[in-house]
Amino acid sequence: MDLTQFNTAGIVWPTVAAIAISYILLSSFLSWYRLRHIPGPFLASISSLWNVLNIVTGRTSPVLEKLPGKYGPLVRTGPNYVLTDDAEILRHVNGARSTYPRNGWYEGFKVDEHDHMGSHIDTSVHDAIKSKVIGGYNGKDGIDLEGAIGSQVKTLVSEIRRRHLGQPVDFSRLMRQMALDAITAVAFGEALGFLTAEDGDVFGYVSAVDKMLTYLTLASDLPVVRSVVRSRRMAPAVRCVLAYTGIGRMLNHTRRVVAERYAADDPGKGDMTASFIRKGLTQIECEGESHLQLIAGADTAVTVLRSTLLYIMTTPRVYTRLKAEIKAAVDAGEVVEVITMAQAQRLPYLQAVVLEGFRMRPAVVYGHFKSVPAGGDTLPNGVRLPAGTAIAPNYIALTRRADVYGADVDLFRPERFLDAEPAKRHEMERAMDLNFGLGRWQCAGRNIALMEMNKVFFELLRHFDLQILYPGKAWDEYTGVVYSQHNMWVQITESS
């Protein structure tokens, strides 16, 4: 045996281990030190493990909801992540005059190597694209949002009568199908047919998204994972993996639809794709915006559909009062075959139910991180944040603030918006607006989501009686950045 080699090996490996441990300890210390003045769980201050554990276990919402009560309005949830439930701080960060750019967190929402409005971190590029697409989202440029969404609500009612009356139905799945058909009808002029498909899952898209939800959340939240997965070298591998899933098949379908429109002499009219083409989006940009509509337009709206209907079904006072308001409107001849948004807005209790539904279960749990600009910034509460710090809303805590909504924030009580004095109602509604973002960052699909909620709630309770089958376990729920619910079993009968 060569003793020289033995001794060298005996020295090298302990040295390597010591250097590695020292590097980890130093990195952890520097991570902690930079934002040491922001309270939060200790593990979150030195690593991303705290956040990973919440995402993997699917308990993000209940954990984040309790943070302000323990740590205050600013809470550190990662080495460089800060969440807040303070409305004034959020208006400062996201307001029209803010210089806070998007954080790299947004890049996690790319579905292929191309960006879209939801993943661009360059503010000027984001603004340029939004200026071209916002008309479509708002129902301008000849787009019939009322007709597109209304037709899918009619399909929902007819499919319930055809297949689901008098027997248990997984309402979480039914609402997902409704949301997907509504957004594809708006986007492409024709729904993909999730509601009418025998298995309710066109291309296997729904099951693929469910299986990949945890991964997609981690890819957005963890900078290391995000940088690897979204790198140019990994793009072919990601594309290859997606090609064999329902997500890949859905993306290929949207690419074909968009390509056919660009190849035609006339892009068509009446849907958002035609509007995007007329406004000057390139084919690649239009594909990206179509992908964004599927991601953001269905998987967020469906949370509010499911949860609000669950709260309605399990709160007899609300169920009875809302049914009575709907019946009175129908009997008085105040509504057409499918209620319009203008007609819905004249029903005060329905509007209060929609607001309270968004409050109890916001479409997003947390996220939409912005970066503190160069030179750092002092927040309205006097706290200084160094440049590059990522700060975002803690949405679930924001909607449960007792000083804004009253001591009974955990109770589903739409009356809080009706009984409040005008100044208090204005304060509550202004705080609710933060769920959709502000200024240039405001959710482009806000009007579509509100229209869908109003039409679905009204028409379902107009035609049917709904009863939750297992009130002791109404659903199975996972929460990461967004909510995901399954096994929400409901019995549906014709309205009595």
UniProtKB/Swiss-Prot annotation:
Pathway: Alkaloid biosynthesis. This is Cytochrome P450 monooxygenase lolP1. Glycans are attached at N252. Its main location: membrane. Keywords: Alkaloid metabolism, Glycoprotein, Heme, Iron, Membrane, Metal-binding, Monooxygenase, Oxidoreductase, Transmembrane, Transmembrane helix. SUPFAM superfamilies: Cytochrome P450 (SSF48264). It is a single-pass membrane protein. Its cofactor is heme. The chain crosses the membrane at residues 10-30. It comes from Epichloe uncinata (Endophyte fungus). The keyword Nucleotide-binding does not apply. Belongs to the cytochrome P450 family. The gene is lolP1. Induction: Expression is induced in loline alkaloid-producing cultures as well as in planta. GO terms for molecular function: heme binding; iron ion binding; monooxygenase activity; oxidoreductase activity, acting on paired donors, with incorporation or reduction of molecular oxygen. The keyword Oxidoreductase applies. It holds the Pfam family p450. It is an enzyme of class 1 (oxidoreductase).
